[in-house]
């Protein structure tokens, strides 16, 4: 049974574009066209406003929490072409870094798994993807993939650090040899996979073609060590695809249509166990989908989104605006 356990009145003055829980599930970050980022304490069903962060000069599209091993850190991106990294010090949130290396709207930010290091991917309407890595002493190193997507990049999502098949193949006590990968979706109707080479440069690893309009979001599913990699993608064409790869080399990806919606699909988000997918679309609903034992994806719930509020859903710990 899926039910709404909490609804947070954010008091944003315009449309909410993203809402993300932190690692521990006690804090909620939201962002809006009103140019603000807000952080709430949502423990025990409450909603206490902790911070109202003002630093962007345009609509804020997305927020992303860093792993807590790096402290209480939040990244945000905006139409104003900026990425801002916020940090909490002694109970006060402050801007700790501002990246202005893009020529157009920055549409997506995503922190890499902590096993990869303190690393942030940023996708922009200028077609480029930036990789920001912390080098210490307040310094950030920037690598940029130019022309990653024709017209623009709308979404980025990191591959999990758990290696597919490690649950059955990894020798006991042996340190994993991680290969950094992430997925991106763009205005060229493509999902692309990127891999870091031994020399530290990033190259296109795979190009996944199935959508007939702009790819609005991609989400690489968490891995529990089973020998399958899974990615969800959604598009302006109203379709959601589930991409799976069963070979160890990661070269063969197969798409499966989850559903064809009657409107644009803006976001897809996996539960932490990767067995439930939340889909948020232009029909003002969030639907939850679960794979049955025979491999069919079934809709198990749909929730109407509120105006200016964020709802927390019990099943799969999914959170959508």
Regions found by a protein language model. Name each.
Residues 1-13, 46, 254:
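A short helix->beta-strand "capping" segment at the edge of beta-propeller domains
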Residues 9-16, 53-60, 99-106, 146-153, ...:
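WD40/WD-repeat beta-propeller blade N-cap
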Residues 9-35:
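Beta-strand-rich domains and repeat architectures in extracellular enzymes and scaffolds
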Residues 19-25, 64-71, 110-117, 157-179, ...:
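Loop/turn segments within WD40 beta-propeller blades
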Residues 31-34, 76-80, 122-126, 134, ...:
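Conserved strand-to-loop turn within each blade of WD40 beta-propeller repeats
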Residues 37-42, 83-88, 129-134, 156, ...:
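WD40-repeat beta-propellers
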Residues 163-170, 177-180, 216, 226-229, ...:
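Terminal intrinsically disordered, low-complexity extensions flanking WD-repeat/beta-propeller proteins
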